[in-house]
Regions:
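Bacterial N-terminal signal peptides that target proteins for export
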Residues: 3-15
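N-terminal signal peptide c-region/cleavage motif recognized by signal peptidases
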Residues: 23-24
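Start-of-helix register in tetratricopeptide repeats
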Residues: 81, 115-116, 150
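Gram-negative and organellar
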Residues: 30-71, 88-92, 100, 119-127, ...
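A structural motif in tetratricopeptide-repeat
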Residues: 76, 110-111, 145, 179
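Alpha-helical segment of the N-proximal tetratricopeptide repeat
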Residues: 78-109, 120
Length: 499
């Protein structure tokens, strides 16, 4: 008797598969590269804006050689008068090796000026980055003569550089109030003092940015578009079953992102901070793929010349398709260390407890722990190279959705000096899931690649609104290829306002 054949849709089987799609890390948690980029951009922009306030006060590396007048060098005799003048001029012209040598000879002579010695030692300590020691020397100097204006100004500068913002503000304000408006020299000094006071005010101002613009994406549903037909034999007959995933969904919409940050100095290096990140997309005629993320963080902050620490509670809220997807309370900490004038290291860590809003996703409830390490290296001609590693441990009630993720990031940035800058960075992450899935008959593992290119054009800014172009490519390769592997492209053109 011939066997009966028929084609049967896999509609019933796709019901659990549609639930499994929610275990995609892209839907489980906020875009890691985006949140990292926005967090790291906050510090960079704050430093750039501060340098703009102080552009006329930054050290000049083109100072003339010591005691060179009209191209002729003059020798310095071994006496208090000539050595004292040489010490002062070498400090003024930032000739630190000369200054150290002349100061050693000067202080070896009996009757040397203790005020000049303290002033020079303070300047040398500051040049070497020993700001606490420099502060001690300048305070010794002012203990000898409290109204010595150069000493007061240098102490205020050291407090500023060492991030003792409250004390520095008081010092500059006292200098400003003591200057005579009718004195031409005081007017020049007053401009310097005002620049530092503006920079100090800016440190405690609300700082942020907001960008919005059109976006196009070609695979909103992260579909592999796979189709496979196989034969299943049963006691009732033999069936041809087609297993197919939907076509990739493309759409236009709006892409947006914003940051808001504030730090308040309390005393010395200590303060408190508040920070918010907002980013997401909203699509025309495909609102079920809309996604938005809000991350708030506040707590304790410590700043000095070489280190920044921040630690405190965080709250994250995510929506998909205009409906709440999850909320997550947690803790976040970071450490920024300036290794040198051209090299910086940042270590970030966060822990959050994710609670999904719908019972259908409650099996995904669980905690996420992440650590990110990033190193920046400034290169000649305004190039910057950066890279890092990250580790994420995701737990959930459903062990088949829990995973350990290891990542590597690498990027390069270039300021072209013509009002245009560009950033290109890539990330590679490998996920190993915790448990075997009986539904999928496999233990899931994935490799994910992401590439992002950002082009900004400040020279085209209108009313300080800067256009930027962002191009992204994302590729996921899964051992469960037919369900979880996909490619995704997006391009957006945003207008950004900083404040």
């Amino acid at each position: 008797m011939p066997q009966s054949y028929c084609k049967r849709s896999l509609t019933l089987h796709l019901v659990p598969f549609s639930l499994l799609m929610f275990s995609s890390p892209a839907l489980l948690a906020a875009d890691q590269d985006t949140s990292l980029r926005l967090n790291q951009t906050i510090e960079y922009r704050a430093n750039q804006q501060e340098r703009e306030f102080l552009k006329d006060e930054l050290p000049n590396d083109t100072a003339a050689p010591l005691l060179n007048i009209d191209g002729q060098d003059y020798s310095v005799g071994n006496n208090l008068d000539e050595l004292g003048r040489a010490v002062y001029l070498s400090i003024e012209r930032q000739q630190w090796l000369h200054a150290k040598d002349y100061l050693k000879r000067y202080t070896a002579l009996p009757g040397h000026d203790l005020m000049l010695s303290a002033y020079a030692n303070g300047a040398l300590a500051r040049a070497e980055g020993n700001l606490e020691q420099a502060e001690d020397y300048y305070r010794q100097l002012l203990a000898m003569q409290s109204d010595f204006l150069p000493g007061r100004l240098e102490l205020a500068r050291v407090l500023f550089e060492n991030r003792k913002d409250r004390e520095s503000t008081v010092a500059f304000q006292q200098i400003s109030s003591s200057l005579s408006p009718s004195d031409a020299q005081a007017m020049g000094l007053g401009k310097t003092v005002d620049s530092f006071l503006q920079a100090l005010d800016h440190r405690e101002d609300w700082q942020g940015s907001f960008a919005i613009g059109p976006i196009w994406s070609d695979n909103l549903n992260q579909s592999s578009e796979s189709s496979f037909t196989y034969r299943m034999e049963t006691s009732e007959g033999t069936y041809l079953i087609t297993r197919a995933l939907p076509k990739a969904v493309s759409a236009h919409g709006a892409d947006y992102e914003g940051t808001l940050n504030k730090r308040v100095a309390i005393s010395g290096h200590h303060g408190v901070f508040m920070r918010s990140l907002l980013y997401g997309q909203a699509y025309d005629k495909q609102s079920k793929y809309n996604e938005g993320t809000l991350i708030n963080n506040a707590g304790y902050s410590y700043h000095d010349a070489r280190n920044q620490y921040a630690f405190g509670p965080s709250f994250e809220f995510n929506t998909i398709g205009d409906d709440a997807m999850y909320s997550a309370w947690g803790l976040r900490g970071e450490w920024i260390h300036n290794l040198s004038a051209t090299r910086m290291f940042k270590l970030e860590g966060d822990y959050k407890d994710m609670a999904y809003k719908h019972d259908i996703n409650s099996n995904l409830d669980g905690d996420v722990s992440s650590v990110y390490a990033t190193l920046w290296q400034a290169l000649p001609q305004q190039w910057t190279l950066f890279g890092g590693v990250d580790l994420t441990d995701r737990n959930s009630q459903d062990r088949t959705a829990a995973y350990l993720q290891k990542g590597l990031r690498l990027g390069v940035a270039k300021d072209f000096g013509i009002g245009v800058s560009a950033v290109l960075f890539a990330s590679y992450r490998k996920r190993q899931y915790d448990a075997y899935s009986a539904i999928l008959d496999a233990r899931r593992n994935e490799d994910e690649q992401s590439y992002t290119f950002i082009l900004r054009a400040p020279r085209l800014a209108v009313q300080d609104i800067v256009p930027s172009l962002t191009v992204k490519y994302n590729k996921v390769q899964s051992n469960i290829d037919w369900l979880y592997s996909y490619d995704k492209n997006s391009i957006s053109l945003k207008l950004e306002k900083q404040f």
